[in-house]
């Protein structure tokens, strides 16, 4: 009897111990959750994705940007710059959507008036574009905010110094943090390892990333992007005797996104054969311009335009740029010597990013071309998995918003006082960019 009694008592003790262990585990879990929650900062930082096509502006911790503005600048054609005489109700310079209106002459290259092509100084026009967006469109006082901006995957000290002048000296932000754009779209997916395929307005990059750190030795790039495709569209529409103004660039981008399709398996001769019955039957693509004009998008422009990314020689046989698939495979190949398991992680986490990747059929084409990819001394081996998020056109901004909402990010800001003490020459040394 005593043995039975002791056995029951022992079981009760085991239950009590188990309950206390469970309670302790739950308490530890709750503490961990609270730690994670406190990791997010209640202070809002301004987040700006400086895109070639569109500038996205919003606040850290939010899901979407407050403003997505075409990176356009225009001058009033009726305004006499020399004598500064113009209609009292008209502006001399306008930006964003307003720059697409017919009375203005749009400068297509607004973004490149800043760091990239003009390393010595930030242009007056680009500064005014940002002032208009921040102060007039969003009603913000820049001196009240720290700002987070993205920089090119290729770190350039001239650009970093130019951003210091632009955001701290000229715009008066109280702090500046710069994040390498290569990692941002990956963070937006919740991953830390993978290959980013960034298809931007003027460049295409492929960058392998391991545990959040870009492997720059394996970065590949091509001077081909969305702008080139848009220009092909423009040429095709002009062939159809439709007049296009410089300010219609925003509309042309919309035409590209809504009518351009990427064949999963491309055959150049097949798509150019005017007598091909399958092609003739293919649905005609129409698009309504803002002035109500209906335009027919030529098949050559609609289908061959996107091929520029996969084979730049289709439109210009003198181009020496590699196509997108070779860029991706080449980046993975450069990391193969590190670790075979790492290679598998990269192949199974290929993340598409950028507005140009939004074209119909784009993810399927990338997967189809990579599947079974081999060259003379490289075999992809594993089946590629393509991550094509529905909001990948704003993936960089989302990544910055997520990172900027963490309280630990605060230490990465270069404060205005520190900048003034150190000077612009040392900003590249002290800026913590990842």
What are these regions (language model features)?
Residues 23-40, 169-197, 239, 399:
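Conserved phosphate-binding catalytic cores of ATP/NTP-utilizing and phosphoryl-transfer enzymes
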Residues 40-41, 47-54, 189-191, 196-205, ...:
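A short acidic Gly-Thr/Ser loop motif
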Residues 39-166, 175, 205, 216-218, ...:
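Conserved phosphate-binding loops in N-terminal lobes of ATP-dependent enzymes
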Residues 174, 178-181, 345, 367-398:
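Conserved phosphate-binding/catalytic loops in two-lobed NTP-binding clefts
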Residues 150-160, 264, 347-369, 392:
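Glycine-rich phosphate-binding loops at beta-strand->alpha-helix junctions
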Residues 245-257, 264-274, 280, 379, ...:
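Acidic, glycine/GT-rich loop-and beta-edge segments that sit at the periphery of enzyme/chaperone cores
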Residues 210, 214-318:
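Phosphate-binding glycine-rich/basic clefts of nucleotide- and phosphate-handling proteins
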Residues 126-137, 300, 305-345, 365:
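Phosphate/ATP-binding catalytic cores across multiple sugar-kinase/actin-like superfamilies
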């Amino acid at each position: 009897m005593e043995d039975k009694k002791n056995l029951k008592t022992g079981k009760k003790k085991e239950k009590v111990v188990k309950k206390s262990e469970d309670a302790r585990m739950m308490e530890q879990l709750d503490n961990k959750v609270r730690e994670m929650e406190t990791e997010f900062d209640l202070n809002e930082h301004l987040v700006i994705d400086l895109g070639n096509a569109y500038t996205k502006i919003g606040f850290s911790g939010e899901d979407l940007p407050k403003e997505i503005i075409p990176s356009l600048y225009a001058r009033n054609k009726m305004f006499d710059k020399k004598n500064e005489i113009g209609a009292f109700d008209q502006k001399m310079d306008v930006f964003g959507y307003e720059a697409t209106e017919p009375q203005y002459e749009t400068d297509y290259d607004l973004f490149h008036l800043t760091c990239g092509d003009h390393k010595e100084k930030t242009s007056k026009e680009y500064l005014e574009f940002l002032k208009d967006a921040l102060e007039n469109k969003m009603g913000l006082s820049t001196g009240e905010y720290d700002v987070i901006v993205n920089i090119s995957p290729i770190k350039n000290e001239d650009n970093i110094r130019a951003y210091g002048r632009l955001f701290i000296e000229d715009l008066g932000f109280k702090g500046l943090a710069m994040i390498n754009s290569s990692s941002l779209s990956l963070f937006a997916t919740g991953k830390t390892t993978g290959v980013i395929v960034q298809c931007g307005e003027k460049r295409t990059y492929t960058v392998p990333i391991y545990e959040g750190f870009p492997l720059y030795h394996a970065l590949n790039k091509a001077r081909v992007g969305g702008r080139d495709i848009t220009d092909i569209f423009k040429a095709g529409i002009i062939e159809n005797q439709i007049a296009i103004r410089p300010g219609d660039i925003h509309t042309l981008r919309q035409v590209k996104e809504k009518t351009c399709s990427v064949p999963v398996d491309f055959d150049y001769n097949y798509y150019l054969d005017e007598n091909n019955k399958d092609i003739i039957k293919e649905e005609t693509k129409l698009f309504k311009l803002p002035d109500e004009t209906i335009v027919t998008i030529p098949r050559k422009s609609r289908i061959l335009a996107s091929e520029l990314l996969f084979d730049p020689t289709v439109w210009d046989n003198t181009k020496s740029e590699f196509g997108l698939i070779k860029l991706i495979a080449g980046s993975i190949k450069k990391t193969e010597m590190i670790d075979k398991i790492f290679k598998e992680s990269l192949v199974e986490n290929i993340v598409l990013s950028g507005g140009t990747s939004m074209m119909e059929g784009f993810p399927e084409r990338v997967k189809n071309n990579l599947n079974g990819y081999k060259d003379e001394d490289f075999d992809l081996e594993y089946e590629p998995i393509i991550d094509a998020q529905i909001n990948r056109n704003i993936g960089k901004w989302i990544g910055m918003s997520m990172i900027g909402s963490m309280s630990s990010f605060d230490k990465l800001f270069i404060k205005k006082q520190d900048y003034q003490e150190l000077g612009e020459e040392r900003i590249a040394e002290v800026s913590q960019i990842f």
